[in-house]
Amino acid sequence: MVGVTAFGNFDLASLAIYSFWIFLAGLIYYLQTENMREGYPLENEDGTPAANQGPFPLPKPKTFILPHGRGTLTVPGPESEDRPIALARTAVSEGFPHAPTGDPMKDGVGPASWVARRDLPELDGHGHNKIKPMKAAAGFHVSAGKNPIGLPVRGCDLEIAGKVVDIWVDIPEQMARFLEVELKDGSTRLLPMQMVKVQSNRVHVNALSSDLFAGIPTIKSPTEVTLLEEDKICGYVAGGLMYAAPKRKSVVAAMLAEYA
């Protein structure tokens, strides 16, 4: 009979549950080590290696073939974000905030931080640039709401910094990503759509004062924006919510004094 000789004194239910536990432990180990292909080895906030690297070892390097002829990517690999960080410790122990040592918006630290992404445009599934200016995107137009093109752009100090000359759209997502603004000196900058408020007669940017618009990182091409440029632009404008706060407060104080 089955189970009398080979498994006469063995519980098959125990075999099943022990096998499941072994499989689950192996799955957890595999998923955790695969998750460590990016972001490891761990570092302190000043860039030095962290003392506690966790219980799992780094996985062996694996090479991925990138789509659209963009080469290969090996992770974990030798590539690292090796740029000077303009921050200084405020305490000896870890976990305390670091203080900027220069202009935090230009240095890209704190709320204005950016990640060293690839300096190439993001592509859609067909290998075309995802984000383009509307003047170069056939078939796109403002179908609803106020068209911001031609409107003046006002900073948080209530001063005019420039005017909107184009909208950059995400082709596959069919949504606006950036406003292209021409400054008073004739140069242009991109503003993230999430950081502007389109009003009936102007575009208001609460994050930046008018004198800070010239510091927005520029783009190399007038018809495309790279992943690195996107991150730098968004970091700079978002950082203004904190670093331009004194100018917003001074404007509010002046308005209150005027009506006092």
Swiss-Prot record:
Predominant localisation class: membrane
One GO location term (cellular component): plasma membrane light-harvesting complex
GO molecular function, one term: bacteriochlorophyll binding
Family annotation (CDD domains): PRCH
Cytoplasmic side: 32-260
Membrane topology value: Single-pass membrane protein
Periplasmic side: 1-11
Cofactor: a bacteriochlorophyll; a bacteriopheophytin; Fe cation; Mg(2+)
GO annotation, biological process: photosynthesis, light reaction
Pfam family, one: PRCH
Regions that span the bilayer: 12-31
InterPro entries xrefs: Bac_photo_RC_H_C (IPR014747), Photo_RC_H (IPR005652), Photo_RC_H_N (IPR015810), Photo_RC_H_N_sf (IPR037097), PRC-brl_dom (IPR027275), PRC_barrel-like_sf (IPR011033)
Keywords (A to Z) from UniProt: Bacteriochlorophyll, Chlorophyll, Chromophore, Electron transport, Membrane, Photosynthesis, Reaction center, Transmembrane, Transmembrane helix, Transport
Location relative to the cell: Cellular chromatophore membrane
Cofactor: how bound: Binds 4 bacteriochlorophylls per trimer. Binds 2 bacteriopheophytins per trimer.
UniProt similarity note: Belongs to the reaction center PuhA family.
Role played: The reaction center is a membrane-bound complex that mediates the initial photochemical event in the electron transfer process of photosynthesis.
Quaternary structure note: Heterotrimer composed of subunits L, M, and H.
NCBIfam families the record matches: puhA
Protein name in the entry: Reaction center protein H chain
Organism listed in the record: Cereibacter sphaeroides (Rhodobacter sphaeroides)
Gene from which this protein is expressed: puhA
